[in-house]
């Protein structure tokens, strides 16, 4: 299953620099507003050290990670819903994203202007949230007259009308659909931005990354959403380094892992996703499924025929397989299980599906 995250933020917050680091693309990242006009789209492999281990065990010719698509759009300014800056029409580029990643500037650099004149993360977060709420309110108010007409003719449309009216009330009160906990099913066709889960990237400098009290204050600003702290410029440098050099560089900074790795992992957790693995001489591959998915659904991610003709799944946990040293040893230890249609997949399951079509 494809996973797409839309990147939003004020101009000069570091969105395009982050996107460049994520995708290793050379997207224009300028120190003036609206450097990004058309959306930039990049597909990123999710770092997963388990793949290299499997490739060694199975002598795989290649590894294929799970992927995340990132969409970087123009900076949003206060009043965008009323036409300020570039307006908000470009938000359509992320309406079908699964989640929204808001990049918020924490670093202070006199050479990089702030559109509001001063660095203020709380104000920036409020600005973006307000503009997304207003954009959704415009969408809802545009569709309401049509729904009201349809509901008069077809009673089956009453539920949809009720859901949209409820969404209108929530948005008019300045709340997001997601935070209000509304049932998003009836609203799915509207692709409302605030119905999506949010995660927050705070773009810091190296001193701020080491400032735990500051990070706790920023984390509290967005709780219960996830907060990720990184320096987008440093992340851009890290992706150009050899792995050993990058690890040494991070260790000197007192950082456990690259911020980009944290972002990918948090994105999966935020959306309730997990990974299962397949391995063989041709390739070792990571596949994305929702948490709670049963074996036939996982099989269908590989190919619809696997789901239609599902018989059973041969499953071993990654940790058990590594401990055993080979599938042969894992079978001898009784660690390889045959699971049926009701088996709930676990993160890190190494699977071979049996099917018949």
Regions found by a protein language model. Give the residues of each.
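Conserved G1/Walker A P-loop phosphate-binding module
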Residues: 1-111
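C-terminal-of-GTPase-core extension/linker across diverse P-loop GTPases
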Residues: 2-8, 13, 19, 146-346, ...
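Residue-level signal for pocket-adjacent positions within structured domains
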Residues: 22-32, 39-41, 46-49, 53, ...
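Glycine-rich, phosphate-binding/catalytic loops in enzymes
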Residues: 36, 86-87, 117-120, 216-219
């Amino acid at each position: 299953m494809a996973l797409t995250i839309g990147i939003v933020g004020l101009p000069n917050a570091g969105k395009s620099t982050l996107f460049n680091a994520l995708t290793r693309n050379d997207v224009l990242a300028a120190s003036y507003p609206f450097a990004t006009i058309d959306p930039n789209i990049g597909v990123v492999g999710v770092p997963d050290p388990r793949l290299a281990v499997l490739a060694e065990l199975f002598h795989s010719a290649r590894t294929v990670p799970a992927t995340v698509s990132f969409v970087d759009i123009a900076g949003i300014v206060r009043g965008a819903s009323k036409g300020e800056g570039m307006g908000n029409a470009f938000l359509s580029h992320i309406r079908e994203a699964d989640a929204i990643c808001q990049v918020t500037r924490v670093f202070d650099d006199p050479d990089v202007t702030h559109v509001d004149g001063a660095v203020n993360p709380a104000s920036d977060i409020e600005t973006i949230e307000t503009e997304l709420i207003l954009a959704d309110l415009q969408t809802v108010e545009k569709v309401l007259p049509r729904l009201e007409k349809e509901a008069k003719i077809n009673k089956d449309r009453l539920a949809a009308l009720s859901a949209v009216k409820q969404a209108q009330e929530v948005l008019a009160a300045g709340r997001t659909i997601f935070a209000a906990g509304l049932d998003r099913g009836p609203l799915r066709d509207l692709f409302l931005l605030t119905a999506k889960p949010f995660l927050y990237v705070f773009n810091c400098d190296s001193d701020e990354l080491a400032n735990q009290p500051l990070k706790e204050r920023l984390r509290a600003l967005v709780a219960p959403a996830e907060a990720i702290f990184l320096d987008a410029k440093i992340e851009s440098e890290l992706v150009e380094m050899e792995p050993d050099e990058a690890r040494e560089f991070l260790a000197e900074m007192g950082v456990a892992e690259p911020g980009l790795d944290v972002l990918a992992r948090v994105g999966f957790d935020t959306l309730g996703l997990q990974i299962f693995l397949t391995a063989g001489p041709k390739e070792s591959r990571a596949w994305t499924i929702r948490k709670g998915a049963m074996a036939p659904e996982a099989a269908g991610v590989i190919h619809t025929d696997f789901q239609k003709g599902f018989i059973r799944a041969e499953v071993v946990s990654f940790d058990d397989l590594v401990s055993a040293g080979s599938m042969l040893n894992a079978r001898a230890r009784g660690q390889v299980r045959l699971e049926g249609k009701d088996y709930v997949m676990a993160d890190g399951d190494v699977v071979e599906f049996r099917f018949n079509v």
